[in-house]
Design a protein with these regions (language model features):
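N-terminal Rossmann-like NAD(P) cofactor-binding module of classical short-chain dehydrogenase/reductase
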Residues: 120-121
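Short amphipathic alpha-helix with an adjacent loop that forms part of the alpha/beta core around
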Residues: 109-115
Length: 461
């Protein structure tokens, strides 16, 4: 359930002042006047020629590219920036580029000033996406949130519900969805070029740079003066600071902070599959993977999903298989009309249809086979659109997003169900999407939602 008032959004963390709480409640009350409006109506509150004011939570890494990407739109103003790291790779660089923006270390204090801006960019590590984004939507803010949408399946469902309840404009940061390559592949499927799709194989075969399949480091290191380590940990279990293992990038290898290789790349590579076939939620899945270390993600896995059939698939169900490991690719005999001399991309998807197969490389032009039936120079090509401008213009009532949370939520739920399956290899998990329940495996069900750190438990979890 989402909270009836903003009190439940405030982590019970010491140091959050009484005045700050009053400001938050006042802001929430003001935001409540717009909650019943749809996105286009809400944008008109600002006026026909209004500008979009944005705040960014997370300004390093993808936060930097998201912030500069959105701010490149001529009708966007950067009002506030927030990061737990004040170095020039994070808040310092953003402050230098946007000197008029208010600066924060604590996202909760930024939201105290919610009356100053209309939209929030969320580019924290995975485990903080939902706490920040849900609080922002509750205050009436549009949200652009990096992928994967959330850290748990339950959070992904709450994000969908909140976006619908509050009528916010939302977009997940799977930017490649807007690239010509992915849009073209989706168009080919929708045009019936290869007929009904019988099966799908998706894979990620490159080596990540973060730690995998290893024990958590022991001991602790001095916390740098420019890093607010407790704020970085947020809702995650409290851990000692270790140089080079968590912040700023290697958090991606640890279960408490990330969603592993499947969560990180699945929202990109499976995206054109979902979009082309109009998939929703799987009904069952089985994973193959080595036993996990207690804290880190595996270095290889295969997940077999089964989805209900759609208008673009053959039969009552459609199998989709995910593979990740260095150098991995799907079995050639399963890929239909693709000739043996064709070198599969390092990462991507193959959709096997009645009349041919489509290869969708990760960020490269798709190919259709057999090539004699699909001459490349005669195939339609869709243009690239700007994923960031699309969201900004949708907030102003001038466009619609293509990766709103009503779409990104089920996609994220799917990849996160796969990460649960990886915990229980060779065991089929049966999924009831409506009930948000793994019906045949009580231990696996416990991972659908995870507890928050003591003192950081919002009521909607």
């Amino acid at each position: 359930m989402l909270p009836p008032d903003s009190k439940s959004l405030q982590p019970k963390q010491k140091g959050f002042s009484r005045a700050s709480r009053r400001s938050f409640l006042k802001t929430a009350a003001l935001a409540g006047t717009a909650i019943s409006l749809n996105a286009l109506q809400y944008s008109r509150v600002y006026g026909a020629n209004s500008r979009l004011g944005v705040a960014s939570v997370g300004t390093g890494g993808k936060g930097w590219s998201d912030l500069t990407g959105v701010a490149a739109s001529s009708d966007v103003d950067v009002i506030a920036i927030c990061d737990i790291d004040h170095s020039m790779n994070h808040l310092g660089r953003a402050a230098e580029k946007y000197p008029a923006a208010k600066q924060y270390s604590d996202w909760r204090k930024l939201l105290d000033q919610a009356q100053d801006f209309h939209g929030v960019l969320v580019a924290t590590p995975d485990f903080m996406h939902a706490p920040v984004a849900l609080a922002a939507m509750h205050l009436g803010k549009h949200v652009f949130c990096e992928k994967p949408l959330t850290h748990t399946v339950h959070e992904a469902r709450q994000m969908q519900k909140a976006a619908a309840k509050y009528g916010r404009v939302t977009q997940m940061g799977n930017q490649i969805q807007s690239h010509s390559a992915y849009r073209t592949a989706v168009h080919w499927v929708h045009q019936g070029m290869i007929g009904k799709v019988k099966e799908v194989h998706s894979w990620q075969g490159t080596r990540p740079t973060w730690p995998r399949h290893c024990p958590r480091p022991k001991g602790n290191d001095p916390i740098p003066a420019h890093v607010h380590w407790d704020l970085w940990q947020g809702v995650a279990p409290e851990r000692p600071y270790k140089v080079g293992f968590y912040h700023p990038f290697n958090w991606r290898g640890w279960q408490s902070y990330s969603t592993g290789q499947l969560g990180d790349f699945g929202c990109h590579i499976l995206d054109p599959v979902f979009k082309a076939l109009e998939l929703t939620s799987p009904t069952r899945l089985t994973a193959t993977a080595p036993a996990l270390y207690p804290d880190s993600w595996t270095d290889r896995a295969t997940v077999h999903y089964e989805f209900p059939g759609t208008q673009y698939t053959l039969g009552p169900s459609i199998p989709v298989t995910w593979y990740d490991a260095v150098g991995i690719s799907p079995p050639r005999e399963r890929l239909g009309n693709i000739p043996s001399e064709y070198a599969l991309p390092a990462s991507g998807s193959v959709l096997v249809g009645e009349k041919g197969s489509i290869v969708i490389p990760h960020v490269a032009a798709p190919r259709a086979f057999p090539e004699e039936n699909f001459p490349a120079d005669q195939l339609p090509v869709m243009p690239t659109v700007d994923h960031y401008t699309q969201w900004a213009h949708a907030c102003l009532g001038k466009d619609e997003t293509t990766s709103g949370f009503e779409y990104a939520g089920p996609l994220t739920e799917t990849v996160l169900l796969g990460t649960i399956g990886i915990r229980y290899p060779q065991q089929e998990l049966i999924w009831d999407a409506e009930a948000l329940k793994i019906t045949n495996h009580p231990q696996a069900q416990e991972w659908v939602s995870e507890p928050y750190r003591n003192g950081w438990e919002p009521a909607w979890v």
